[in-house]
Structure formats: C-alpha cells, structure tokens
C-alpha cells in the first residue's frame, strides 16, 4: 500500500490486528503495530481498539484490555456491545463473574443495549458455578428486553441443573422447554443432557438421549461420548461401556485423557483387568503414556479380578517406566492382600510404603485402620501380629515433635547440677 502511496486508515489497521491475532502473533506485537500506525497518522477508533482489546483478552490480559478501554473512553470513543462482550467473556472464563457483572451494569448504565451474546456470556459463567436460578432470572430479563433466548442460552440452563446430582429432572425439563419453543438441540445440548442423566444415575435415559441425538442427525462429539461412558462407569455396566467405546472407535473419534481414565476406572472397579489392559494399549497408540494414576487403577483391576499375585509385577513395570509409586499404589496393594487374607504381604508393602515416605492422607488412613481393626479379630496368631503391626504403626504417619525446651528450664537444670557439685565438694 505504502509503495503505491496509499495511506492505511483505521479500517486497514483493525483488519491487520485481527489477522495478526489469528496468525498467532502476541497482543504485544499487535500493540506495537498499532503504535507504528498511530505515528503514521492512523487515529484511535472503535474498530482498531476493539481488535486490540480482543487480542489482549485472548491472551488472558484482561486488566491491560480494560486500560485500553479506559483510554479509549477518555478520547471520546464510546464502547459498543462487542467491546463489552469481549471484556465480559474474558472475565467470566477466568471465573471472575463479579467483574463481568460490573461491566454488565456499566454497559446498561451507559445506554449500551445488551445482545443475546451478552446474556449467554453471563449464563455460561453461572452454569459453571451451578447456579441455575440466576440463569432462569437472566432468561426472563432477556425476554423482557425483547431478546429471544437461543440454543446456547438453554444449553447453559441444562448444564447448570445437570451438574447437580438431585437436579437431573430439572435439566431434562429445561431440554423439553427448549424443544417446545422450537429451538433445535445441538451436540452441546445433548451432551449437557447426557451428563445430567449420568450425574443423576439415570444411565438408561442417557443412552436413550444418545440414540435420539443420532436419530436427529446430530453427530456426537468426544464430550458426548465421554459423558455417556461416565454414565455407564458409574452404573458399573462394563458390557455397555465396551459397546460405547467400540462405537466411538468406529466413529473415528479420538479420546482424551479424561475418556481414558473413565474407561480404565470403569473396567478396573469391576475387576476386568484384560479390558483395562486393552484401554492402555489402544490409548498408547495415540500417545497417552501410562501415569502413576493409570497403574493405580490397573492394580485395582487385577486385585478385584482375583489376580493379586500379579501386583508385584505391576510394581516392577512402574519402576521400569520411572513411575514412583504413591500412597494410593501401596494402599491398593495392602487392601488387595488383606482381602485375600495374605496379611504377611500386606504388612510387607506397608513397610515399603513407610520406607519410601509415601504416607496416606488421614481419611484414607482411618479407612484402612477400620478395615484392619476388623481383620485383627482373626484367631491366627501370626496373621494377628502382622495386622497389629500395621495398625499400631500409625501407617507411617508422623508423630508430633516434642516442643523445644525453654532456655530458662534448661539453665535451671544446669544450675541444680552445679549446686549439687558444690555441696559434694
């Protein structure tokens, strides 16, 4: 442009800042570019500053974005709904809802008309905070202003109810209300509903919702599959868990670490150690390396599947992968051996746990003590001795150190000794 003697203006500048943001340039780069353009005569404008604020907000630099908005207002450039929405969204996503509410109040006080996006930003924030009653009020306020709630508005409401165990029916009701007013559900809406059923323990309804979704031609996402898998993990239905996982693989949907842990835990808790191994193998193909948590769940699978003799081998595998066993690893092994009344091995791994400095938290310790106290009623003297060895050791929990002696009493004792020597002399 400049070689052809064409001077860039504020529109050119705002487009360039947007392109820079999308190409991965930092907010600092965008600010420096704007300053260069400003020196060349490009003035401050709503378009330019809106693009700059977006760049800063995307990097989480909310306070800096707020300073730019403040400077903009000082120069007589009023913020519009887009600028306010950008700022509110940044604060909401950082769980700073009070600041977002403050901007919402300022926006209305200055006569800037909120949009559907404005309300959806607040609804999304309150959804994450599990406050459906506030979302219900925002929906009413929105309608009073002549704005129609959309699919995102209702999805926030479904999600807010669905995150709470005893409100799954309210989530289902919100879903029906949405359909009643003619709004078509999206993948996000169905995922929120499936998650609600999962949390509420209604795994059959979760699967029905999944089937309805597919019937309506809506493609399930990884979030949908993860929510559905979690429903059947909670229900302990490993057969359907495997079926859903196979469906996911046939749809060529790659799992996440959350999906991996849900599947592994689901099979482990029912003692399906072969399936648990399959999960580790399949997810290993897409780069998910086993962690200490992975091995803890795998040990649980082998223990519950009656394969406690394989646990030492798993411990060796961990060492070969440079994974350090934690208190949960050792507790899992101790539980496994106590379950089959192999108290000697339980005591051995308890000693290993204490030796390695891996001490369970007080709650886990109390749980283990209560189990061992019951087992200590055994008539076998050797077994009883091994159990009491664990119980009485306080599981390696640190004993409170004695307080430092007061110097006065230390000297007093010394003085007595001196006096006694003097008398003896």
Question: Model-found features: residue ranges?
Answer:
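N-terminal targeting peptides
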Residues: 2-18, 22-32, 36-47, 60-66, ...
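Pentatricopeptide repeat
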Residues: 9-14, 18, 30, 45-50, ...
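Non-globular disordered terminal and juxtamembrane segments underlying protein topogenesis/assembly
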Residues: 21-22, 57, 71, 92, ...
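TPR-repeat structural position
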Residues: 27, 62, 97, 132, ...
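Alpha-helical solenoid repeat scaffolds, predominantly canonical TPR units
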Residues: 33, 68, 103, 138, ...
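TPR/TPR-like (Sel1-like) alpha-helical repeat modules
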Residues: 343-360, 373, 384-396
């Amino acid at each position: 442009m400049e070689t052809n003697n064409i001077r860039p203006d504020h529109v050119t500048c705002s487009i360039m800042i947007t392109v820079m943001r999308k190409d991965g340039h930092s907010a600092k780069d965008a600010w420096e570019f704007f300053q260069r353009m400003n020196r060349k005569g490009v003035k401050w404008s709503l378009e330019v500053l809106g693009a700059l604020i977006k760049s800063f907000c995307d990097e989480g630099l909310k306070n800096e974005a707020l300073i730019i908005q403040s400077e903009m207002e000082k120069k007589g450039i009023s913020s519009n709904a887009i600028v306010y929405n950008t700022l509110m969204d940044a604060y909401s996503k950082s769980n700073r809802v009070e600041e977002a509410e403050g901007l919402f109040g300022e926006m209305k006080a200055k006569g800037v008309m909120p949009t559907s996006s404005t309300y959806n930003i607040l609804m999304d924030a309150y959804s994450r905070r599990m406050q459906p009653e506030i979302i219900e009020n925002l929906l009413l306020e929105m309608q009073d202003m002549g704005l129609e709630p959309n699919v995102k508005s209702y999805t926030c409401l479904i999600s807010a109810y669905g995150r709470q165990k005893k409100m799954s029916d309210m989530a289902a009701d919100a879903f029906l209300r949405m359909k009643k007013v003619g709004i078509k559900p999206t993948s996000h809406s169905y995922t929120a509903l499936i998650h609600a059923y999962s949390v509420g323990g209604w795994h059959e309804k979760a699967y029905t919702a999944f089937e309805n979704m597919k019937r309506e031609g809506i493609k399930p996402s990884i979030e949908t599959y993860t929510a559905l898998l979690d429903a059947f993990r909670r229900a302990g239905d490993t057969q359907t868990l495997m079926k859903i996982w196979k469906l996911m693989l046939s749809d060529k949907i790659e799992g996440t670490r959350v999906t991996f842990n849900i599947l592994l835990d689901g099979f482990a808790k029912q003692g399906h150690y072969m399936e648990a191994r399959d999960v580790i193998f399949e997810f290993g193909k897409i780069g998910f390396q086993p962690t200490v948590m992975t091995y803890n769940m795998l040990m649980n699978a082998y223990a519950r599947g009656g394969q406690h003799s394989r646990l030492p081998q798993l411990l060796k595998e961990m060492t070969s992968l440079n994974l350090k066993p934690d208190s949960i690893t050792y507790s899992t092994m101790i539980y496994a051996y106590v379950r089959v009344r192999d108290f000697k091995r339980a005591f051995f791994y308890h000693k290993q746990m204490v030796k390695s400095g891996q001490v369970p938290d007080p709650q886990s310790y109390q749980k283990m003590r209560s189990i061992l106290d019951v087992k200590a009623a055994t008539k076998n003297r050797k077994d009883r001795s091994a159990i009491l060895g664990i119980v009485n050791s306080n599981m390696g929990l640190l004993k409170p150190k004695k307080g430092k002696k007061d110097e006065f009493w230390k000297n007093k004792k010394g003085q007595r000794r001196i006096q006694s020597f003097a008398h003896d002399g």
